[in-house]
């Protein structure tokens, strides 16, 4: 038989008020009084005692009935509240009238019930309780010989029963008003921060975008130095905006925790890549120590953990002029088979924290000294953000001195043990832009120093539609997209987007979220209606300075394919477009083609390599590109065979995803299509068909290789030349 307690807890936990708690207290107190009377006067008989006992039993039965009513109908009920109040005062007043002096302590119960109703239900109930309690006590005064014999005491207590709750009512209303005003002020602050973020991000978008375009042009040494200064200043300003938004989200309780499997040591390595050069520039010793008993594979919010470490270790580097900065990770408790609690210590030999600042160390906009905000850059939000994120992840954070100088900031986090990570071989997601030289070398992907050139070599030209009400933003996006090889049409409103899409087809749309008239969300909803009625599907990327969780979630629900924050980074924008290009590519006949043997029709879409050739990088470059991409494709096929043999269907889909991306880069239509089919197959389908699919892939890849060899040989011998389709 199951215990009813879990059901009772679930039934009462979601109630809007605490009526059930007050009723439970009433039941407990009444039961105790009945038990006491039964024990104390078990051999005593009398009408007064019997009347008192019957009153208490009646109150207990009615209270039990109220509790049943609460369980059956958990919604707020003003009728039940009034019945409970009337029950309390009538029973208390009746017992005080019957018992006289022995029941005089019940006056405190009467006052307690009055104040309790006010605290639980507000001023209106406090005034109603005051009236009920006063009338019941007045009845006791008029009936009981004891209270009649003490008129000064009786009328004084009655006056107190009226005056004290009324004074408390004035305090309660003042407190309620203060809480309401504080809530409104906090909401106004959040709106102000969101608006200021939008206003800051909009000009930053133009500044950041144009400097990225400028960085790809020919500059002399002095111009490069000036450009680097501008970009560093823009990044610093953006960092300040991000910090203010982070603290706003933390205060509003809107931090979302996303727990995933990750490698702790790899994550710490990524932090070191950012902060170690800064420490080296300040001539500091910088190191990390991870204890041997700390597991490497964990499950947690790696993004927020990295942000906490960047804040704390970054502060240590910033406020240390001599000595060292050390990050230590140790295991506090937990079994390696289940979960662990890890402690992170950030030790430095810097300026330390003065005694008078320590109580306010984790408060917003605080630094160890007023003058430090001038000497060191920053808002003073780093430790506050770290505290909010650590507590949101279920941990604790603190500070201690580091003798003889400096400080140690520490935090502890509970972590689950992660699942073994997939193959460590470098995977290049479809359309991904790989920036790390080590990854590029190990994966044999051609690396161009110019991100726009790299994008043009891998992604075919697309027709883009851009909508933004700010001319500077439209200009930035147009320059970035055209430099990446795309054809761009810019409009200044959502209505123009719908009109343009009704006239022509576009491969992708980039739209600002907040525009005069119809905004981006309304445009998305209208576009989905149009597409449901037969219009060609077009992915939409939302670009906005409003990066609140509500805005991002609203865009996802409206059908946006991606959300990018202003100021847009060229690499992030190009990465997103590369992913869209692979998923929506229509292998149509282009304006410029290269003639290949008819036996290769359907195998090779030569327009992809034609666009690469149009960049004018030479025949040798094209041959090298083809050779290395074919090697990548062959490796992906080998990975598919290995994954199928191991029955690792999730990894097999990732291998097929990588193969589709490489094949699309070469224009191998059949291979790309087969890779896409593998990605969409269920586990049971893969288990039954993967060997047959693998055999087909190998045949298609061989045919594609022959077609590419024929093309490259034809270009080399001068047998085929570009021609224009009329």
Curated annotation (Swiss-Prot):
Phosphohistidine sites (modified residues): 198, 657
Gene that this polypeptide is encoded by: rpfC
Membrane protein topology class: Multi-pass membrane protein
Main location: membrane
Name the record gives this protein: Sensory/regulatory protein RpfC
Pfam families with a match to the protein in the record: HATPase_c (PF02518), HisKA (PF00512), Hpt (PF01627), Response_reg (PF00072)
Segments forming domain HPt: 618-711
Protein source organism: Xanthomonas campestris pv. campestris (strain 8004)
Topological domains, Periplasmic: 1-22, 73-94, 149-151
4-aspartylphosphate sites (modified residues): 512
GO MF entry, a single one: ATP binding
Keywords associated with the record: ATP-binding, Cell inner membrane, Cell membrane, Kinase, Membrane, Nucleotide-binding, Phosphoprotein, Transcription, Transcription regulation, Transferase, Transmembrane, Transmembrane helix, Two-component regulatory system, Virulence
Disulfide bridge map: none
Result when mutating residue 19 to A: Cannot interact with DSF. Significant decrease in EXP and EPS production, as well as in biofilm formation. Substantial attenuation in virulence
């Amino acid at each position: 038989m199951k215990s009813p307690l879990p059901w009772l807890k679930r039934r009462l936990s979601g109630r809007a008020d605490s009526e059930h708690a007050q009723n439970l207290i009433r039941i407990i107190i009444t039961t105790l009084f009945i038990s006491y009377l039964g024990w104390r006067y078990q051999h005593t008989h009398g009408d007064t005692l019997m009347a008192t006992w019957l009153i208490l039993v009646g109150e207990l039965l009615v209270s039990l009935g109220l509790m049943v009513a609460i369980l059956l109908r958990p919604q707020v009920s003003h009728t039940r509240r009034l019945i409970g109040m009337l029950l309390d005062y009538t029973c208390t007043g009746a017992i005080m009238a019957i018992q006289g002096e022995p029941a005089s302590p019940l006056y405190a119960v009467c006052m307690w019930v009055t104040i309790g109703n006010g605290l639980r239900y507000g001023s209106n109930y406090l005034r109603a309780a005051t009236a009920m309690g006063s009338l019941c006590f007045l009845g006791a005064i008029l009936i009981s010989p004891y209270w009649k014999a003490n008129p000064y005491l009786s009328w004084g207590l009655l006056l107190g029963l009226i005056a004290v709750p009324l004074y408390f009512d004035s305090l309660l209303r003042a407190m309620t008003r203060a809480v309401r005003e504080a809530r409104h002020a906090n909401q106004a602050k959040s709106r102000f921060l969101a608006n200021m973020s939008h206003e800051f991000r909009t000009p930053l978008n133009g500044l950041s975008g144009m400097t990225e375009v400028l960085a790809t042009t020919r500059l002399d040494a002095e111009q490069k130095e000036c450009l680097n200064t501008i970009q560093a200043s823009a990044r610093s300003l953006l960092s300040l905006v991000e910090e203010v938004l982070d603290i706003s989200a933390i205060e509003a309780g809107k931090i979302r925790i996303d727990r995933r499997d990750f490698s702790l040591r790899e994550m710490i390595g990524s932090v070191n890549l950012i902060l170690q050069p800064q420490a080296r520039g300040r001539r500091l010793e910088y190191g990390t120590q991870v204890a041997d008993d700390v597991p490497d594979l964990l499950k947690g919010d790696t993004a927020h953990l990295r942000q906490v470490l960047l804040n704390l270790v970054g502060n240590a580097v910033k406020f240390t002029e001599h000595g060292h900065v050390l990050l230590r990770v140790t295991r506090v408790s937990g079994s390696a088979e289940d979960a662990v609690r890890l402690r992170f210590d950030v030790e430095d030999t810097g300026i330390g924290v003065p005694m008078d600042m320590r109580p306010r160390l984790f408060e917003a906009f605080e630094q160890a000294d007023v003058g430090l905000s001038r000497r060191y850059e920053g808002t003073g939000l780093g430790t506050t953000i770290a505290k909010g994120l650590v507590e949101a992840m279920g941990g604790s954070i603190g500070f201690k001195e580091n003798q003889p100088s400096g400080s140690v900031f520490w935090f502890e986090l509970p972590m689950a043990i992660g699942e073994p990570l997939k193959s460590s071989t470098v995977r290049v997601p479809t359309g991904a832009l790989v920036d790390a030289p080590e990854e590029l070398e190990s994966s044999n992907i051609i690396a161009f120093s110019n991100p726009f050139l790299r994008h043009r070599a891998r992604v075919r030209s697309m027709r883009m539609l851009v909508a933004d009400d700010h001319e500077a933003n439209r200009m930035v996006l147009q320059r970035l997209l055209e430099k990446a090889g795309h054809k761009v049409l810019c409009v200044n409103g959502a209505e123009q987007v719908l009109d343009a899409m009704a006239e022509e087809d576009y491969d992708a749309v980039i739209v600002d979220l907040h525009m005069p008239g119809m905004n981006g969300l309304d445009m998305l909803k209208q576009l989905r209606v149009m597409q449901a009625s037969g219009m060609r599907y077009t992915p939409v990327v939302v670009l906005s300075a409003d990066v609140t969780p509500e805005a991002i979630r609203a865009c996802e629900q409206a059908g946006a394919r991606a959300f990018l924050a202003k100021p847009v980074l060229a690499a992030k924008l190009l990465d997103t477009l590369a992913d869209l290009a692979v998923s929506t590519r229509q292998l149509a006949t282009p304006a410029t083609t290269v003639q290949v043997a008819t036996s290769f029709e359907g195998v090779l879409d030569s327009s992809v390599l034609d666009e690469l050739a149009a960049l004018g990088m030479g025949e040798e470059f094209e041959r090298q590109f083809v050779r290395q991409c074919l090697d990548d494709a062959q490796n992906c096929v080998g990975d598919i065979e290995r994954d199928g043999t191991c029955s690792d269907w999730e990894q097999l889909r990732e291998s097929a995803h990588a193969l589709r991306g490489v094949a699309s880069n070469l224009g191998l239509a059949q291979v790309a299509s087969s890779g896409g089919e593998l990605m969409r197959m269920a586990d049971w389908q893969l288990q039954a068909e993967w060997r047959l699919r693998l055999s087909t892939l190998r045949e298609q890849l061989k045919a594609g290789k022959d077609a590419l060899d024929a093309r490259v040989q034809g270009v080399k011998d001068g047998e085929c030349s570009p021609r224009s389709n009329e």
